């Protein structure tokens, strides 16, 4: 008699055997798209590394949820985020990158070639791996928040603050990131409401002092965001104060600054990360603690998080990968 557990174990073994038999060997594998992944692909392809790129769950990354991008060189009239990522993708493919839709579900970086499982069914064996999986902004989870993403709701003041020049905006969050966003917006916008759920700021004392010393920032302690309102764009926000009273603030932009989650979970058994999950790279490079595995873009950058810096680190990762492969006689 065969028990279910034994049957399941045998099925798993058979599946693993089937996967292993179909392993595809590649020189350079890029995990993730967006500015970092596509730029890495452009440089890797031009270096004749025959890169294979898996786009992941959100092809094009965070920029595909952005309407207008006006701060990336080469687009003097601005460009829609999705169109910009399509341009990056076409350029990567033009030089020979094999761009594929698929999600990397597990990895084994214990030895080279590195084993990467895609969609729980296909194995890639790669001599070099570039991780460009990005980070996901944390949101409040309101329906109205989803409704206005790209139409007044943003998770990046540096990216979108300019659209609200001379207008009133709100920033939600009480840490250093929220303070930095509020201070940045204070130099562009007429008024900045800082919505803080607790009755105190979690930011450093120095950052708090800068916020409280800025005349056009109003800190609303003990306020919870209940709803973002407007017709086609954001027009206001409904807050609940510590007394349970509902208060409306008229705003044009709503900036969420409660943190990001780096998409690094599947790499943690092998790759060193900080306490927040950002991949740690060696200073001045994209090298991780595993030789032959490189990281670029927002998965390793918690300071800048810009398309241009992500693209730059993607270039670095491809150059680092090419040099690594050359040193090992594999380029």
Question: What do the PLM-derived regions correspond to, one by one?
Answer:
Residues 34-35, 58, 135-137, 176-177, ...:
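Residue-level detector of alpha-helix initiation sites
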Residues 5-17, 21-23, 136, 141, ...:
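FAD-site-proximal beta/loop scaffold in flavoenzymes
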Residues 25-27, 101, 165-167, 222, ...:
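Phosphate-coordination loops involved in phosphoryl transfer and adenosine-cofactor binding
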Residues 20, 26-95, 167, 179-205, ...:
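Beta1-alpha1 glycine-rich phosphate/pyrophosphate-binding loop at the start
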Residues 2-11, 92-118, 123-126, 187-283, ...:
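A Rossmann-like FAD-binding core segment of flavoenzymes
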Residues 309-325:
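An active-site-proximal "capping" alpha-helix that borders the catalytic cofactor pocket
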Residues 99-163:
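Glycine/small-residue-rich loop that forms an oxyanion/phosphate-binding "nest" at active or ligand-binding sites
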């Amino acid at each position: 008699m065969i028990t279910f557990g034994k049957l399941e174990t045998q099925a798993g073994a058979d599946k693993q055997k089937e996967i292993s038999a179909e392993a595809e060997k590649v020189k350079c594998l890029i995990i993730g798209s967006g500015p970092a992944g596509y730029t890495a692909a452009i440089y890797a392809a031009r270096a004749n590394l025959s890169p294979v790129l898996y786009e992941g769950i959100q092809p094009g990354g965070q920029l595909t949820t952005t309407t207008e991008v006006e701060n990336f060189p080469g687009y003097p009239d601005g460009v829609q985020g999705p169109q910009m990522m399509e341009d990056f993708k076409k350029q990567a493919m033009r030089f020979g990158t094999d761009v594929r839709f698929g999600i990397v579900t597990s990895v084994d970086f214990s030895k080279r070639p590195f084993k990467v499982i895609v969609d729980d069914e296909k194995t890639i064996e790669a001599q070099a791996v570039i991780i460009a999986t990005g980070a996901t902004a944390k949101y409040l989870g309101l329906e109205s928040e989803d409704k206005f993403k790209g139409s007044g709701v943003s998770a990046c003041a540096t990216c979108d603050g300019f659209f609200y020049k001379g207008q009133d905006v709100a920033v939600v969050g009480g840490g250093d990131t929220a303070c930095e966003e509020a201070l940045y917006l204070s130099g562009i916008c007429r008024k900045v409401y800082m919505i803080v759920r607790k009755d105190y700021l979690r930011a450093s004392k120095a950052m708090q002092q800068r916020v409280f010393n800025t005349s056009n920032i109003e800190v609303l302690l003990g306020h919870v965001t209940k709803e973002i309102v407007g017709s086609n764009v954001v027009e206001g926000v409904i807050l609940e104060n510590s007394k349970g009273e509902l208060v409306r603030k008229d705003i044009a932009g709503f900036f969420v600054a409660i943190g990001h989650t780096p998409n690094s979970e599947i790499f943690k058994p092998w790759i060193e990360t900080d306490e927040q999950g950002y991949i740690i790279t060696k200073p001045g490079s994209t090298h991780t603690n595993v030789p032959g595995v490189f990281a670029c873009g927002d998965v390793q950058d918690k300071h800048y998080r810009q398309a241009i810096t992500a693209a730059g680190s993607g270039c670095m990762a491809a150059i680092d990968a090419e040099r690594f492969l050359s040193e090992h006689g594999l380029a």
